[in-house]
A protein has these predicted regions:
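Conserved short histidine dyad/triad with adjacent acidic residue
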Residues: 30-46
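A cytosolic small-molecule/anion-sensing beta-strand core signal
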Residues: 27, 55-56, 72-73, 91, ...
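A short, N-terminal "cap"/entry segment at the start of jelly-roll beta-barrel domains
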Residues: 1-32
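Structural motif
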Residues: 30, 39, 58-60, 84, ...
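Ligand-binding loop in jelly-roll beta-barrel domains
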Residues: 81-108
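Short acidic-glycine-tyrosine-enriched beta hairpin
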Residues: 65-81
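Glycine- and acidic-residue-biased ligand/ion/polar-headgroup-sensing regions
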Residues: 38, 47-49, 53-60, 64-65
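Beta-strand residues in well-ordered beta-sheet regions across diverse protein folds
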Residues: 34, 54-55, 62, 88, ...
């Protein structure tokens, strides 16, 4: 049976920053919703790319050795595997992350 997911309902339940919550699975991929508030430490993922989609708010992704990436609502970016990055937000922002199920959102 097809799944209907109310993303905004999940947003209203989010309280803790930097604690991604799985909201859907598609094959071997997972969609996680996260509240970004402040800055997450620099990290990387050795085995997989990571996609950030800004649902609400704005984030900046610091990328080691490259210009910062600024994402506003409706924008997304793919961070390739092995690229050190650090997402941050000045105000609470809600992000959808599309990634392999086995990926540790906190990095290697």
């Amino acid at each position: 049976m097809p799944s209907i997911i109310d993303v905004w309902d999940h947003v209203q339940q989010m309280r803790q920053p930097w604690a991604p919550k799985e909201i859907a699975r598609v094959n071997d991929q997972v969609i996680r919703l996260a509240l970004f508030d402040g800055e997450f430490p620099m990290h990387k993922h050795s085995n997989a790319d990571e996609l950030f989609y800004v649902l609400k708010g704005q984030i900046t992704i610091r990328v080691k050795g490259q210009p910062d990436i600024v994402l506003t609502e409706g924008k997304m970016a793919v961070i390739p595997r092995n690229v050190e990055h650090s997402p941050k937000s000045v105000k609470p922002s809600y992000i959808l992350m599309f990634e392999p199920l086995a990926l540790n959102p906190r990095g290697d």
